């Protein structure tokens, strides 16, 4: 989702800064595959959203934060729930606090349909009860609630997106739809 968002924002003429986790290969993930006219217009910064001072510094002079950083493997969340809390909850808190301190115009929180658990009614609406069926889902619920609290407590403009079963180009084979 993030690589498609970056591509679209660049094509619309926006300045884009993205934070990617440092890795030994210095890989930028899907950004490495972008055409030069897109890739050369992205400011890429390697770092960790769990580093509060780093995030505060890197979000200065930013108008909108699209927060997509998260650990997402549901099965692995059972093996390492602490890492999910650290990245998905504390990382989100760092992003929200930086947005507040740097007077960001809008904070877009990317969540997941997993926050609803098994559907209790169809169609699922925003009024559907939240039900964490995995440590991953619990961290995303916590992240969403933190975002809402920053709206309610600090009037930080927040938008929460909860995508369902995304698919398409650049899709991870982990989430491939069988044919």
What are these regions (language model features)?
Residues 141, 166-179:
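Glycine/proline-rich active-site loop of Rossmann-fold NAD(P)-dependent oxidoreductases
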